[in-house]
Amino acid sequence: MIYATGDLHRNPLRFQSQYFPEQAEMTKNDYMIVCGDAGLVWHGDKSGDPQLDRLEALPFTILFVDGNHENFDALSEYPVEQWHGGKVHKICLHVIHLTRGQAFELQGRMFFTMGGAQSHDIADGILDMESSDFYGQYDSLCRNRGQFRINHISWWQEELPSDEECAEARQTLDRLDWKVDYIITHCAPTAIQQKVNADFKPDKLTDFLEEIRCRSRFHYWLFGHYHDNRIIDEKYVLLYEQMVRVL
């Protein structure tokens, strides 16, 4: 069995048995895919995290692509390993980060992954703790309820993929003749994002995903980011707190 869900934001309450009774029939060979913003290594501590211990104790394996609200400094500390045909970071034995531009064969189906998204809650800017006027800016923005984040504390430029990651994604899809069963991302391709919320502006990543949407053949595209549960044009599945069966 394979299930998918949307943003966790470090709150995996939905995986408790009263909310997800289907897990009674699952094993570690079954998967729950989180479509970004999992936040499971937010504090960067590789050991002694009771939440990771609780997730490891679940009967299924958790897979996640990264979103924009991730600690990319912490994720990069994990060694890159090969798993089911693609590159991963193993956070725990059964909590696994599926990296960008990869393809994984899971239960006889091919899954292409491309995490990341541009933050939309930074209208008032990104603060740098090394700046001489950081505390003045911080206090002012807090008093005025500003929308801001702090570099390497609550925001990372790695939220958007590098040119190298996009090139690797194209190479992966070239190898597969641009045909996969499922595409897992955090944000949506530009055309689909406009149908979700026309107020969101295209960016480097949504335009790249639009290229993938136009060139590839796939059954379903699952994504998160927009905090809603909807199906768009029959094959694009936007997930937030819902958990849906994929296989």
Predicted feature residues:
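Generic domain-boundary/flexible-linker signal
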Residues: H43, D73, I122, Q193-Q194, ...
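Core catalytic region of metal-dependent phosphoesterases/phosphodiesterases
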Residues: T5, R10-L106, A198, P202-L209, ...
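Structural motif
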Residues: I2-A4, M32-C35, Y182-H186, L222
